[in-house]
Structures are given as structure tokens and as C-alpha cells.
């Protein structure tokens, strides 16, 4: 068996083409969607992510800007800027690129963003709404994964789903979305005993652990849908995911590649959330 590859890059482009008409309609009514990304420090990976987010917005006609601070900036300055952006009617989405320098209280910064402009879906109010099954904004990576399930005609109802990783950014919201979709969900972490026992029973396997090629083919149930959220850079400079693609490709029914899988969908759903925020503000 050779798995069907779920092409996240192609799906992302298809969705973005559809977004253009929504952006044009909003702009014509004086509600051009606007996203501001705040970057503290000069982490090379974060700079790439921020550039891709800003360029993604501009490519479909949205307004976007990057605000950069030196890593030594005090937290109060950033909080004051967030308060200013919260009050700006032309800005519909505010995103603070993580991680922040160690002297920052990450939770306090994320909570300072208005829940109505929290397009990352990290504000406690939005996390609670997601847990209740009535989300305002879905965190972008899990949102992208759900769109991939939708595109691949993956029926989640009654399926055994295993999520490896329990981060607030991916693992926890991913588990909630799967629960809300009717799956039976197990969340595994670094302390899980006999991980293979759980993964080998999974109809849906989501790997978000941050370890290169961590999930191997012998851990996968034949015919399973394998979603690789990881992005890891190897010593030779190449990118790979948390899944050993070659071995899992021969066992899985559907699988996402790295690169070209979940990654492009993450930024695409950030655009979706920002457009949705603008539509709500416009009463559409």
C-alpha cells in the first residue's frame, strides 16, 4: 500500500484564491481586512514566519504590517502598542510572534490582545469558546488540519484519533476539534507509556511533538490518516517532519508531506481568521 499524499500547498492556494473575492467585497465597503504582526527580537525562524504571514496578506489584497522590537524591549512598551492596535478600527487581527524573550510574561501579552482581534485563537476567551464547541477563532494550525480532513473526505465520526503532543498551540486545540467532530481522542505526551500501543490503534494520527522522524511506519495502523505538523531542520539543512515519511508512506492510507503539507495551511487559516474578523466588524 502506498498512501495518498494530501497536498497542503495546493489546497492552500485554492483557498487563497477564494479569499480574494471576500477581501475585494470588504474593501469595496470600506472594511479592508488588516493584520498586524508584532515581532520581538531577531530569531531567524520567527523572521521567516512573519515575512510569510505579511506577504500572504498582501498577495490577496489585505493590509498587513510588521512591527519589530529589539529583544531587550520592555514588556510595557509592547502592551501599550497592543492597546493602541486594539483601538484601531482599521486593524482586524493582531498577532504576537512566539516565542517571546524570557523577560516577557507570554500569557499576559496574549491576553492583552482583544479577543475580537485574536486571530491566533490563543486568548483565554477564545480557548473557552473552542472548548464549548462554539469557536470564534480556531488556532491556525489545527484549523488547517481540519480543512485538510474536509478536502480529503475524511469522516472523523466514531474514529479513533491520537494526537502526539499537548501544546496550547497545536495539541490541545487539535484534540478539542477532533472531539467536537465526533472522534474518540487520545492525547499522548512525553510521559505516555507504550506510545506504539496507542498510535497503532489510531485511524487518525496527528504528530506535533517537534522531534525529527519520530513516528515510524511500524507505529502506524494500516490505512490510517497521518498528519505531520512538525517542521524540523536537519544538520544538512533539509526540512523534515515528526513523521518518517518514507516508512509511513507504505502503511498509511493518507499522509501529509513536509514541506508542503500542514505548513502552507497554517498561514492560509490565519488569513481566513483575519477576513472573518473583518466580516464580523462589518456586520456581514
From Swiss-Prot:
User: GO terms for biological process?
Assistant: L-histidine biosynthetic process; methionine biosynthetic process; purine nucleotide biosynthetic process; tetrahydrofolate interconversion
Q: In which pathway does it act?
A: One-carbon metabolism; tetrahydrofolate interconversion
Q: Which UniProt keywords apply?
A: Amino-acid biosynthesis, Histidine biosynthesis, Hydrolase, Methionine biosynthesis, Multifunctional enzyme, NADP, One-carbon metabolism, Oxidoreductase, Purine biosynthesis
What reaction is this protein's catalytic activity? Answer: (6R)-5,10-methylene-5,6,7,8-tetrahydrofolate + NADP(+) = (6R)-5,10-methenyltetrahydrofolate + NADPH; (6R)-5,10-methenyltetrahydrofolate + H2O = (6R)-10-formyltetrahydrofolate + H(+)
Q: What is its EC number?
A: 1.5.1.5, 3.5.4.9
Q: Which GO terms describe its cellular component?
A: cytosol
Coiled-coil annotation reads none
**InterPro entries recorded for this chain?**
Aminoacid_DH-like_N_sf, NAD(P)-bd_dom_sf, THF_DH/CycHdrlase, THF_DH/CycHdrlase_cat_dom, THF_DH/CycHdrlase_CS, THF_DH/CycHdrlase_NAD-bd_dom
Drop me one GO molecular function for this one.
Answer: methenyltetrahydrofolate cyclohydrolase activity
Residues holding NADP(+): 165-167, 190, 231
Q: List the NCBIfam families hit by this protein, alphabetically.
A: PRK10792.1, PRK14186.1, PRK14189.1
Functional summary from the UniProt entry: Catalyzes the oxidation of 5,10-methylenetetrahydrofolate to 5,10-methenyltetrahydrofolate and then the hydrolysis of 5,10-methenyltetrahydrofolate to 10-formyltetrahydrofolate.
Q: How does the record describe its quaternary structure?
A: Homodimer.
Q: What name goes with this protein?
A: Bifunctional protein FolD
Give the organism the record lists.
Answer: Dechloromonas aromatica (strain RCB)
Q: Lineage of the native species?
A: Bacteria, Pseudomonadati, Pseudomonadota, Betaproteobacteria, Rhodocyclales
Q: Which gene encodes it?
A: folD
